[in-house]
From Swiss-Prot:
<dbReference type="InterPro" id="IPR050376">
    <property type="entry name" value="Pterin-4-alpha-carb_dehyd"/>
</dbReference>
<dbReference type="InterPro" id="IPR036428">
    <property type="entry name" value="PCD_sf"/>
</dbReference>
<keyword id="KW-0456">Lyase</keyword>
<dbReference type="GO" id="GO:0008124">
    <property type="term" value="F:4-alpha-hydroxytetrahydrobiopterin dehydratase activity"/>
</dbReference>
<protein>
    <recommendedName>
        <fullName>Putative pterin-4-alpha-carbinolamine dehydratase</fullName>
        <ecNumber>4.2.1.96</ecNumber>
    </recommendedName>
</protein>
<comment type="similarity">
    <text>Belongs to the pterin-4-alpha-carbinolamine dehydratase family.</text>
</comment>
<dbReference type="Pfam" id="PF01329">
    <property type="entry name" value="Pterin_4a"/>
</dbReference>
<feature type="region of interest" description="Disordered">
    <location>
        <begin position="1"/>
        <end position="30"/>
    </location>
</feature>
<dbReference type="InterPro" id="IPR001533">
    <property type="entry name" value="Pterin_deHydtase"/>
</dbReference>
<dbReference type="GO" id="GO:0006729">
    <property type="term" value="P:tetrahydrobiopterin biosynthetic process"/>
</dbReference>
Length: 112
């Protein structure tokens, strides 16, 4: 469940672990169903909508603070009323448990 993932803390990825297989990533997506797996299975992405630019910017700022705290950082694009977040562990050029932990934590920041 996403609550279990939200309660976890990211562990530093040293880069000496293999990325998740596409099948493993699909299983993890069951815990973060709002996220989409890329065609190559190397990242997950979700788009968010907001009432205006200020709300989108506030979400991005909160996500930035969370990323700094956890030591794991997303790619973020945003504009008036929207944001798109992509998680991938760059050291392994693919997905790691940390990406799903952070996806769940990102969901916790999203407007309801």
């Amino acid at each position: 469940m996403s609550d279990e993932l939200q309660s976890r803390t990211c562990t530093p990825c040293r880069g000496d672990v293999p990325p998740m297989t596409k099948a493993e990533a699909k299983r993890q997506l069951a815990q973060t169903p709002a996220w989409t797996l890329s065609d190559d299975g190397r990242c997950i992405e979700r788009s968010f909508t907001f009432d205006d630019f200020k709300d989108a910017m506030s979400f991005v700022a909160k996500l930035g603070e969370l990323a700094e705290t956890e030591g794991h950082h997303p790619d973020i694009c945003f504009g008036w009323g929207w944001a798109r977040v992509t998680w991938q562990t760059k050291k392994i050029n693919g997905l790691h448990d940390n990406d799903f932990i952070m996806a769940a934590k990102t969901d916790g920041l999203a407007p309801t």
